[in-house]
Every structure is written in C-alpha cells, then in structure tokens.
C-alpha cells in the first residue's frame, strides 16, 4: 500500500533552500552537492546508452538521516551534470523508513534500480527488503516491489545491494550483520533479478581467517581489475590502529581471487581506501571505454557531521571527485578522473609562501628529505616529511586537535581544492587523503618549510549542474 506523498513538501523545500545553499561560501564549485538537505552515499553509478548516471542518498527535507530518497544526476562527460527527477521516495510499506543504498543495471531493456527498503518497528526492531524499480519513458521510476526478504540468520541490518552480470548469471553482494552481531558480506546469484539464492559469506568476521572485523559491513562492491578481484566495503566496529582506521567508520579494500561458481573470495589483508577525515560508501562502475571509475561520499556517518556549519545554510555534504582505479604491482591506485583537466584554467608556475585560497589544482614533486607545511586558511594543516603525510584540524564540536596519516615516501603530490574540501593524491594515486574544511573567506593557502617548493597550479572552472 502506498503511503501519502511528500512530494509537495520536497518541492517547497528545494525551492526555498536552493538559493541559500548556492550563496554559501562553502558550497562547492566543481564537486557535486545537494541543492538542499543532506546527501550521503553514491548509488546506482552506471553508464547506459553512453550517458552516465549517478544516484545518491538524499534527505531533501532536513539536514539529517531521517527521510532517505534517491536523488539523480546524469551526464554525458562526467563534468556537466543535469538534475533528473527524484528516482525513489520512501512511500511504500516495504521502504517506509528509507530507500537505502544500492546499484543500477540495465535489465530487460530498461535502467533498473536495486535498493534496500528499510522498515523499522515500534519495539525498536527492524527488517530490510531488497527491492527493484524500473525506469519509465519519462525518466521517472516505477517500483516493482521486494525481490528478497531478510535472509535467515541475519539481523535487520542487511543492505546495499551491488548487482552485476557475469557468465550469463546475475550476482549480488550485500552488506550484513549476522545474529551474533558480526559483520559479513553475502553473495547471492539469480537467473534474473527476481529470484535470488544465497551462495554464502565471502568476507567479514571469521571469514578467510579475519578476526575482530567489526559488527556490520556495509556498501560492498566486488569487481575485477587487471588480474585480480577487489572487494571494497565499509566495516563498522573495526578496531582503530595507531595511524590507520581512525575515522568512526573506515572504507577498505582487499584483493584476491573470486570463484563465482563456488562462491569463494580468497582475499588478502584490509587496506584503507582513503586516509583523510571524510571518505565513505564508495561505489564503482565500469565505463564503456573499460575504465573502472569510483566516486565516494565526502563524509562519515556518526562523526562530527551534525556540527558542520553548512547546516545553518540548509545543506550538508558533497561527493568526492570521480576517480580512475588501476591495479599495479599489487597495489590499488586511485587517480583523478582524466576529464578533470578540462576544468583547468591557464597553467601558472609558482614559488612562494602564500596563495589566495580558491578552487584549484596544485602539482609538485618532492625530494626524499623534503619537509613541507600547508595551512588552509587556519582550518586544516598538511605536514609532509620523510615519514609521509599528516592532516590536522580541530574538531567541530571541541577544540581538540585531530590527525590523519598516510605513511610512505611521498614523491609527488596533486592537490585538488574546492571551497570547503581538499583531495590529496600521493605518488600518482598510491595514496589519497580527502577532507572537508570550513575556512573564512577571503583566506590564504600558506606554505612553510626549509626549502621553497616550486609547483604548478591551475584555477578550476565550475562543474556545471543544470
């Protein structure tokens, strides 16, 4: 049974909130962000008939996680984006507490969304349904209803279907928590998208010898890359280490051999996907040209998000830039989308101590004994030395200083700056650090160190959103 539509309230919220958000000095110039309300996980990242689609978790009514819809952008070039109609709203009994994350595939000639319908009960319990919706001729979506109930042996925390086709069959990975409150990744298979069979657990606590791996794994994504398979996911409850897994919840990758017929993923250790303050729920897709592309949410759930100053302007959070994934010598590399060079203005050489803070790209090489400091208008500090990189900033809730680390020899940096974010690509993508910061404007980027650094910079044009 359909629930009362909240579309009129959503339209009113967008009309009232958009001018305020766009006027905010922290609203991004070339990253994707909500016109109002809260954005989180990227969903349904795909390319169909040559056009890219990026859906996203969106609460258009408030800057909190209460009313989860699927927003929708599309693009011909990953630079110029168009707002599409809202794809999903929680207006059925089986998704009444949120249309949670999922993926998109082409099925029976139509773009089809695979998502989790979240249902909460008055006694504090919950359940989850894996659901389908198919695109209509006018670009809206028609819900087909649930296709998979909660599997036996797992709590109501089963979500985020990532679906793909392989060797004539459909496969799906789901994030899950078993009844012993241990995080898992489940593998399902089907001849179509309607009747799924559980193959087994392919990753998580007590799988492949992995102990103490947290109480819930979410946002899984399993895909081939070069001569290996990679599983990306977000374990909740993973133990923090001295300089790793420091966010409330991290995003990780592991490489290994995937046997679809036997339902086995024989993988190695967990690696942090991004070492910055804000990165979560990444999703990948394979473009028509063969590239494996990734986009992530530049946020972390249950962190300092409710203290971000943009909430006062009616919006919160943004996406990362799109990244290209490559597998080289046993390491995952993330490189900035090559199309981003089209946003560059004229190249400018620079060797000095201060720059006006603005949306831009910086690139420079480092010698093995380099020591370097960058201060982002007092809101974020980067330190580079022979041990690696450290990002530092004060908490939004307290004045306590917090740090994030990347360890290794930094030989080259590419730094992408927007009005309230930075993404630092280390050694052509061997490491990445993504973080939000909220400076006062006008602000300065201040360099320090024993040796002046010569670098190239490009001011970045806006990423157009229609």
From Swiss-Prot:
InterPro entries: ConA-like_dom_sf (IPR013320), GH32_Enzymes (IPR051214), Glyco_hydro_32 (IPR001362), Glyco_hydro_32_AS (IPR018053), Glyco_hydro_32_C (IPR013189), Glyco_hydro_32_N (IPR013148), Glyco_hydro_beta-prop_sf (IPR023296), Suc6P_hydrolase (IPR006232). It is found in: Cytoplasm. GO terms for molecular function: beta-fructofuranosidase activity. The lineage of its organism: Bacteria, Pseudomonadati, Pseudomonadota, Gammaproteobacteria, Enterobacterales. Its main location: cytoplasm. Hydrolyzes sucrose and sucrose-6P, but fails to hydrolyze any of the phosphorylated isomers of sucrose and other phospho-D-glucosides, including maltose-6'P and trehalose-6P. GO terms for cellular component: cytoplasm. This is Sucrose-6-phosphate hydrolase. It comes from the Bacteria. The keyword Glycosyltransferase does not apply. The gene is scrB.
